[in-house]
Each structure stands twice: as C-alpha cells, then as structure tokens.
Amino acid sequence: MNLYDVIKKPVITEKSMYALEEGKYTFEVDTRAHKLLIKQAVEAAFDGVKVASVNTVNVKPKAKRVGRYTGFTSKTKKAIITLTADSKAIELFAAEAE
C-alpha cells in the first residue's frame, strides 16, 4: 500500500476540533492500514511532523434508508494522531494561516 493512499481526509467534527487544541489530529484512513503505517504516512505527508502516538477506531456501518429500501454506509477507520512537543503543527486550514 502506498503511503499517500493511507490518509483519506481529515475528520472535521466538534469533538475533533476540541482535540485539535491538545495537539491531536483526527483523520479518516484506509481500513487496511495499521498504526505503524499510519505513523509513517503522516510523517511523510507533512514536513517537520513527529508522531508521538496513534490511536485507531473502527467505525461500524450505519443503517440508512432511501424510501422503503434500507442499506448500510461503508465501514471506516479513524486515526487520532498525537504529535510530540517539539513537532511542527499540521496545517489543516490554509485560510487561517493567511
């Protein structure tokens, strides 16, 4: 698996924004990725970033309805990345930097 295919997108929720103040970043990652691979992908994608720890959460599929038909959303995996104290911050929102 290519390192740049591991991270899909950042998770932008109220809970993840509070964790951002503590230096914890939340990303949706490939379901086949393990913690060491996620750590390598984050350090390769963002310059000057050192990862202290990686916590992962498997998100179960939710039942959704369209009219009378029921189906399920896809299962996903979230990774909560904690950076070291001497690490650079990850620039998630480029508009804030301007």
UniProtKB/Swiss-Prot annotation:
One of its GO terms (cellular component) is ribonucleoprotein complex. Disulfide bonds: none annotated. Transmembrane segments: none annotated. The keyword rRNA-binding applies. Keywords: Ribonucleoprotein, Ribosomal protein, RNA-binding, rRNA-binding. GO terms for molecular function: rRNA binding; structural constituent of ribosome. It comes from the Bacteria. InterPro entries: Nucleotide-bd_a/b_plait_sf (IPR012677), Ribosomal_uL23-like (IPR013025), Ribosomal_uL23/eL15/eS24_sf (IPR012678), Ribosomal_uL23_CS (IPR001014). The keyword Chloroplast does not apply. GO terms for biological process: translation. PANTHER family: 60S RIBOSOMAL PROTEIN L23A. One of the early assembly proteins it binds 23S rRNA. One of the proteins that surrounds the polypeptide exit tunnel on the outside of the ribosome. Forms the main docking site for trigger factor binding to the ribosome. Part of the 50S ribosomal subunit. Contacts protein L29, and trigger factor when it is bound to the ribosome. Belongs to the universal ribosomal protein uL23 family. This is Large ribosomal subunit protein uL23. The lineage of its organism: Bacteria, Bacillati, Bacillota, Bacilli, Lactobacillales. The gene is rplW.
